[in-house]
Amino acid sequence: MGGCVGAQHDSSGSLNENSDGTGVALGRNQPLKKEKPKWKSDYPMTDGQLRSKRDEFWDTAPAFEGRKEIWDALKAAAHAFESNDHELAQAIIDGANITLPHGALTECYDELGNRYQLPVYCLAPPINMIEEKSDIETLDIPEPPPNSGHESQLRLRLSTGKDLRLVVRSTDTVFHMKRRLHATEGVEPGSQRWFFSGRPLTDKMKLEELKIPKDYVVQVIVSQPVQTPTPVEN
């Protein structure tokens, strides 16, 4: 992405240098191919996790290199491409003067020669997609024995912007920690997605198995507004 002005990319044939020294996309501009990329995620991914990964890319990519209007066009084209509206995707690409040397959105150039690369997860879901866990599926997660394991505080950062420390036990599963968070913050367990070092945590994982370093911040994506918990009568 970016940094292509004045550069020559004869090996790929995607860029050439004009006599005035300006690198522009020339030749090998192929129509957008209809075939969607097939790929497998490093871990089984839910629809919600895929959406979060895409949102993270589109929120950060334009901040580094390239032109915002081109990123906006590529986002719209990617959405049309995945929705099988191939004609609209091609019209968006042509309207923004975007060149596709290989007929794919994974490598694109604008008219100034800036390079843009879209990851495959923005163009198609992985072949190992899984369904979101339902409340029924979580019923088979056994309760840990009372007062088992050792108590500690886990640092959480909610997508709402709130940081907090949650009292947990080492034998807790992720699902039981979600229930603890629900009791303190009013966020339904089914509306929480937990991430540790960028990896999604499944409900059956145990805290003691995750080996989360002390004071490490666990990210919690909340998919609904946080509700104020109802006070409990003593």
Swiss-Prot record:
Where is it located?
A: Cytoplasm
Polar residues bias: start-end ranges: 9-21
| SUPFAM superfamilies assigned | Ubiquitin-like
PROSITE patterns assigned to the protein according to its UniProt record, in alphabetical order? UBIQUITIN_2 (PS50053)
Which residues lie within the region annotated Disordered?
A: 1-46
Major localization class: cytoplasm
Q: Give the matching InterPro entries.
A: DC-UbP/UBTD2_N (IPR032752), DC-UbP/UBTD2_N_sf (IPR038169), Ubiquitin-like_dom (IPR000626), Ubiquitin-like_domsf (IPR029071), UBTD1/2 (IPR039869)
Q: Where is the composition biased (Basic and acidic residues)?
A: 32-41
A GO cellular component entry from the record: cytoplasm
Where do the Ubiquitin-like domain residues begin and end? 152-227
Protein name according to UniProt:
Ubiquitin domain-containing protein 2
* Originating organism: Mus musculus (Mouse)
What is the primary gene name for this protein? Ubtd2
